[in-house]
Each structure stands twice: as structure tokens, then as C-alpha cells.
Amino acid sequence: LIMEEITIYHNPNCGTSRNVLSMIRHAGIEPTIIEYLQTPPNRETLIELLQSMGISARELLRTNVPEFEAYGLANQAVAEKDIINAMLADPILINRPIVVTRKGVKLCRPSETLLDILPVPLPSPYIKEDGESVNPIEVKGEKDVIDD
């Protein structure tokens, strides 16, 4: 087993979350698994995760759950702190999986996003639940930005 500290905020009922967890294990790493619906992050942790990902609470919101409507979160005027309050009250509003590695923190949707922050390359192609293959060759270090 490769000694790497990786944490995944995981929902076992989510296919993307399961794929990302399997990809981490496929790379030879056993991550710390936080089933965030059972043990949601506290305010400080949630804010830290958002800052590390460089996204707003709105960008982390799940919009396809009844709670999204119930809290009136479709209204763009809802303040960041109020979105965070709703997420803390109802963690189902937090999109997943969030993965923390030494290379960064990301909301890994689609699951291939994991490759951007996975500290080691996949040893071989990983086959997702739907049969789609993720190739280790796609793992890049620093991305070259090419302007069109």
C-alpha cells in the first residue's frame, strides 16, 4: 500500500463517489473515508474545503434534491453564508465526492477529475461501474496551458 494521505468525502449511494473511491484504491492508496451524510463537516472545515477548491458554496450545491427547492436556493440572491448554513443543516445539499490530497482539493465530478490531484499515477486502466475505461496515461503533472 502506498503511504499517501488522501481523504474522500464520500456518499456510498453515489456512483461517481464509488468510482472515485475505487480509483484511489486502484492507485494503491487506502484513503480516509468520511461518509459526510453521517458525519458532515463543521462550518470551519466546509469553508476551508471551499477555499482550497477555489469555488463558491453555490458551485458546490446539489441542485437536484428537494432540499434545494425547500431552502429557496434557486434564488441567485441567496448569500454565500446562507448557502453554507443550509449545507450544514442538510448535508445532502453538498455535492460529492470531495477529495483532499497533497496535490490539491477538488470536487471530483466527473470522476476523471481525480487524476488532476492523484499524487501517484494509476498502475493500469481503471474500469468504471458503467464499463468506461480511465487510462493511466491521462495522468498529467503540471498542465501546459495553451491559449487558442
Predicted segments with their positions:
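Non-globular targeting/processing and membrane-anchoring segments
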Residues: E4, L88, L93-N95, V100-D148
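Structural alpha/beta surface segment adjacent to cysteine/selenocysteine redox centers
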Residues: T7-P12, T16-E80
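Glycine-rich loops and low-complexity Gly/Arg-rich segments
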Residues: T32-I34, I55-L60, N85-A86, P123-Y126, ...
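Compact, basic/aliphatic-enriched, mixed alpha/beta core segments that act as assembly/interaction modules
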Residues: E59, A70-R102
